[in-house]
Amino acid sequence: MAVKSYKPYTPSRRFMTTLDNSDITSKPTVKKLLIKLPQKAGRNNLGRITSRHREAGAKKLYRIIDFKRNKFGVPGKVATVEYDPYRNCRICLISYVDGDKRYIIQPEGLKVGDTVMAAEAGLDIKPGNAMKLKNIPVGTVVHNVEMKPGKGGQIARSAGNSCQIMGREGKYVILRLPSGEMRYILGECMATIGTVGNAEYQNITIGKAGRSRHLGIRPQTRGIAMNPVDHPHGGGEGRSKGNHPVTPWGMPTKGYKTRKKKQSDKYIISRRKK
């Protein structure tokens, strides 16, 4: 899959790039795996903005993904590779021998016709197979990793991401996360072998404002361009700066650590690198 550029027929097209989508084999065919999500657009139940610069974006249907991979011992064949508007990686439709069909995140190298399976242990170390962390060899690259047994994968789910199993200690497995953080994860948690596909996604250029709006991203106004009532950086004569960068609510930003202490901090061996 290559990055596709365009001739500059318009100024917005000059720098815009996309992926060629040659890996997509089908449109959605299983309607029971498609649902319509309510559009929050960054608002809470009172209609107030809780997440700025968000909007609904283009109309789309949510694909129900099998993050738990709990269909043990039943082989399934990759029927299609599809586009998912809610994520930057591709998804695969798995058709199991018992007639069940489920979507999974597409690992790098998995193609139509390949067979995948989930089990507690004893499977081949090949992309798409899922096992418990305690039964996967040290050094293996995995994705879609659970943080709590049975909850479903939460770690390393976006395009090109993966974790690496670094060792074992008692009932825990030492995992290196995509950020570089080293962390203990229970060995009972499930993980899928391989790296998430569509790694070239990071190389595309949005190129124009309208494409961001389709993705549900609204424009960001600089604080220095606002009035004093709207932002601590606002006001002044001309272009005045002269103060430390802060959020609209006065909290220091750009490098200031705001992460609260959590009970789960004891599972972090080393924090991520900058």
Curated annotation (Swiss-Prot):
Task: Give the Basic and acidic residues compositional bias ranges.
Answer: 230-240
Q: Which GO terms describe its cellular component?
A: large ribosomal subunit
* Residue ranges, compositional bias (Basic residues): 256-274
Region called Disordered, residue ranges: 223-274
Please give the biological process terms from Gene Ontology that the record holds.
cytoplasmic translation
**Family, per the entry?**
Belongs to the universal ribosomal protein uL2 family.
| Full protein name | Large ribosomal subunit protein uL2
Check the record and name the SUPFAM superfamilies matching this protein.
Nucleic acid-binding proteins, Translation proteins SH3-like domain
Q: What is the lineage of its organism?
A: Bacteria, Pseudomonadati, Campylobacterota, Epsilonproteobacteria, Nautiliales
GO MF, one annotated term: structural constituent of ribosome
* Pfam family name, one: Ribosomal_L2_C
**HAMAP family noted in UniProt:** Ribosomal_uL2_B
Quaternary structure (record): Part of the 50S ribosomal subunit. Forms a bridge to the 30S subunit in the 70S ribosome.
Q: What does this protein do?
A: One of the primary rRNA binding proteins. Required for association of the 30S and 50S subunits to form the 70S ribosome, for tRNA binding and peptide bond formation. It has been suggested to have peptidyltransferase activity; this is somewhat controversial. Makes several contacts with the 16S rRNA in the 70S ribosome.
Which keywords, in A-to-Z order, does the entry hold?
Ribonucleoprotein, Ribosomal protein, RNA-binding, rRNA-binding
Which PROSITE patterns is this protein grouped with? RIBOSOMAL_L2
Please name every pair of cysteines joined by a disulfide bond in this record: none
